[in-house]
Amino acid sequence: MDIPRIFTISESEHRIHNPFTPEKYATLGRVLRMKPGARILDLGSGSGEMLCTWARDYGITGTGIDMSQLFTAHATLRAEELGVSERVHFIHNDAAGYVADEEYDVAACVGATWIAGGVAGTTELLAKSLKPGGVMLIGEPYWRQVPASEEIAQACGVSSIADFLTLPGLVASFDQQGYDLVEMVLADQEGWDRYEAAKWMTMRRWLEENPDDDFAKEVRAELTIAPERHVTYT
């Protein structure tokens, strides 16, 4: 069980696997007003940066679930590095359909709502692991400008215009599901640049070190199109 290899390769040097920066995560942790000892479940936890830094800075405890063997190993090492390995734990598992045995104060899925088929399915999934009165934390891309055609949407790297909503549409969707939106922190262009552009050097160095790998052709193809796709559509 693992994520597609292109992500394992291209994001192998990432600490954060979405367009948030460390500063954005610090802001998000602060505005959530979590008390020390608050328990967080993070589905699609990646390399664990959110849980590890929040354990260090805000005294939370937590569990992260991720399908990537590499990222889960990185998360465990990061917890040890920051001295929080007794507070946060990371499990290599499929986050799709994952329901915790215990209820959490915060149930999160940041940038991985595909685990439940989108935002609506993810809210339903997270609610099953959330204490009454708890906080649900969801990170989701949105269209700043709706593509004029399905072809343009696919050029952005998604399968359909329907994959994402506009920001007003996304905000309205929570109300439609019966939830109050109580805070918001938005990624910015710098965060998108850091998330996307950091992949390019990683892929280039991987190609230099693995020229005869059977997967090199796919990595080369992605490296060729990724920069122009990013500056055109992000």
Predicted regions and their residues:
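Class I SAM-dependent methyltransferase SAM/SAH-binding core
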Residues: E49-A96
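A short SAM/SAH-binding and catalytic strip from SAM-dependent methyltransferases
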Residues: V106-V119
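A short glycine-rich, Lys/Arg-flanked "PGG" loop and its adjoining helix->strand segment in the class I
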Residues: A120-V135
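Conserved Class I S-adenosyl-L-methionine
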Residues: E183-T234
